[in-house]
């Protein structure tokens, strides 16, 4: 195809700026995704893929960007920051087929005969040749290039990626957008008993769904996998409980918990406040009828004190003392004379005190808060 030859000769290849070791790891991850897509074409294979991504509720395979969000720690965060902070220009390039993540969800090469495959390839080159950064043909492949990781994610033209690979075509012509990624020093990955976690800036925490898929890439990028949870982080149990909260399940993006929020919550729960005996969860007071009887007895004692005035001063003093003691016993449970940590209060009082403290501290810290992405 002469037009195809012209396009290949005049269009530059995609510039790979990551290190060679990262590039090799990226090719390995893309190859794994290709194998997963192949498995997804059968019921048994889909079941195997489902064991890796049990919470995925989309198509039988993951689209490229969802795959990246699932396996690359905080890819979704890096992408959201770039999308909100700047506009990235697009350009035409010949993209190495081996680094492109596709998705054969509509059709695969096996669904097409040789002539149909040739038509798809021809259409790809024709759409590419008629496209420019200012105007993109609807059939032109459109890709996202994560430059620091050396991976390309297909946005438009996902199905044809497998065809180019099966035909052993070394490059796919595409319109490309560049994306960045988080600097390796901002990330930490922890492989712990029963779970794997990624931490961004010592603050945000998300689960690493499939560390075995992305370990080589992350280590090549400069993020070592650690096995001990730092003591200066929020308590691991608290982090896992927040990540396991049912309200965070089946979210479109991986859920991340904020350790600053968890530290603030813990500080509020451990704050001592004035409380009554009625507010403390561990205190078990006598039933209400006991206080009613005591109140009646107090009234009787007070009346008796009045009746004894002037006639039996010693008895009056004794009754007054008893009335005072009984009055103290009746009123002590409702007097805020003890200090207690918020976490030890009864539910209603604990929540009231907790939200009051949290609101106050949040307002105090708002002026000095720093965005973890800044």
List PLM regions with ranges:
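Surface-exposed polar/charged interaction patches
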Residues: 32, 39-42, 59, 127-131, ...
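Charged, amphipathic alpha-helical linkers/stalks
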Residues: 181-233
């Amino acid at each position: 195809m002469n037009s195809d030859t012209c396009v290949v000769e005049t269009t530059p290849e995609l510039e790979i700026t990551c290190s060679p070791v990262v590039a090799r790891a990226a090719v390995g991850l893309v190859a794994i995704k290709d194998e997963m897509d192949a498995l997804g074409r059968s019921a048994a294979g889909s079941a195997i893929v489902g064991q890796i991504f049990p919470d995925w509720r989309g198509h039988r395979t993951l689209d490229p960007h969802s795959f990246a969000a699932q396996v690359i720690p905080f890819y979704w965060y890096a992408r959201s920051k770039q999308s909100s902070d700047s506009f990235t220009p697009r350009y035409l390039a010949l993209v190495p087929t081996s680094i492109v993540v596709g998705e054969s969800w509509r059709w695969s090469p096996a669904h097409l005969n040789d002539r149909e495959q040739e038509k798809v390839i021809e259409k790809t080159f024709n759409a590419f040749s008629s496209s420019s950064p200012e105007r993109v043909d609807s059939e032109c492949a459109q890709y996202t290039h994560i430059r620091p990781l050396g991976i390309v994610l297909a946005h438009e033209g996902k199905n044809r990626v497998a065809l180019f690979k099966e035909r052993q075509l070394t490059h796919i012509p595409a319109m490309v957008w560049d994306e960045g990624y988080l600097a390796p020093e901002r990330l930490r990955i922890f492989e712990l008993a029963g779970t794997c976690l990624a931490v961004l800036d010592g603050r945000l925490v998300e689960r690493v769904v499939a560390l075995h898929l992305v370990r080589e890439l992350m280590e090549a990028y400069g993020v070592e996998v650690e096995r001990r949870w730092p003591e200066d982080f929020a308590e691991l149990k608290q982090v896992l409980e927040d990540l396991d909260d049912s309200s965070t399940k089946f979210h479109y993006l991986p859920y991340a918990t904020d350790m600053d929020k968890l530290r603030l919550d813990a500080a509020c729960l451990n704050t001592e406040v004035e409380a009554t005996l009625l507010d403390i969860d561990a205190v078990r007071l006598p039933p209400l009828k006991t206080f009613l009887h005591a109140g009646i007895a107090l009234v009787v004692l007070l009346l008796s004190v009045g009746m004894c005035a002037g006639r039996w001063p010693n008895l009056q003093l004794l009754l007054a003392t008893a009335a005072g003691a009984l009055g103290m016993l009746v009123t002590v449970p409702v007097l805020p004379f003890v200090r207690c940590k918020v976490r030890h209060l009864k539910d209603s009082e604990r929540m009231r005190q907790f939200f009051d403290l949290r609101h106050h501290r949040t307002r105090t810290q708002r002026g000095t808060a720093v965005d973890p992405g800044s």
